[in-house]
């Protein structure tokens, strides 16, 4: 018989939950989950994936597939920005479109010409580097041609020909870790220039600055992870709006919202067994099931082998003395 020739095997939250429930004897093979038991294990699965997001669990492979690169434009007279999808958060996106005005824009113009409208759609947010400084934001009413856009009635402000234009559909998510940061110069959007900047690892580094609101291109940023967004503070107030931050970050794990467990698991295939057995381990006490040495060995193999895929440059060692009832990661960086 020939091989399948396919490589797209996937599982749903329900399938991971049922496999974990079978492992600890909550259900027999082929049985369906009771609604209350399903809700209990779905909640445990969500708690698990949130704990395993980013790098806090020391699973190096997670850095590869949750990595995103976002662009964060600057605002006038501002050095603290909130990154996240909430309405009050600042404008950053992992799919930022950057171009330039092909002709000057009058203060209240509704018809504008840009170098390229590629990837722009009606309803997108669009911002123009203004002649008076700062960025004026509005929405796109329609994309009329390869270079033409229509805007709603607005008082965004005047912008010069060649001014930088930013556009995006969705804001970036609150990220849970940052790996790199650069200051990007968009003077030539087709060939932007990146300048490396520092990431403060201690709030004291920022607090020791004698002038925190001095104008200038940022050379360092402070990153503070909040409950619903991530705060970015620059060490200077950016005066040049044809420049932006470009951050390489780790996105959070997705939620599993569907009450019946129909959501696909948003993990690579090599993590499926690790998720199954870690969920089994965390769920066993909830159902009064004993965690036996045999189950512990199955768990150890599944988790150890799963997390060794797609490694980055991180040194790991296994802690064999960890108690089997410990629901944290069995791995530690050094």
What are these regions (language model features)?
Residues 1-106, 118-334:
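Glycine-enriched, solvent-exposed interface loops adjoining structured elements
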Residues 109-115:
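Short alpha-helix capping/helix-loop boundary micro-motifs
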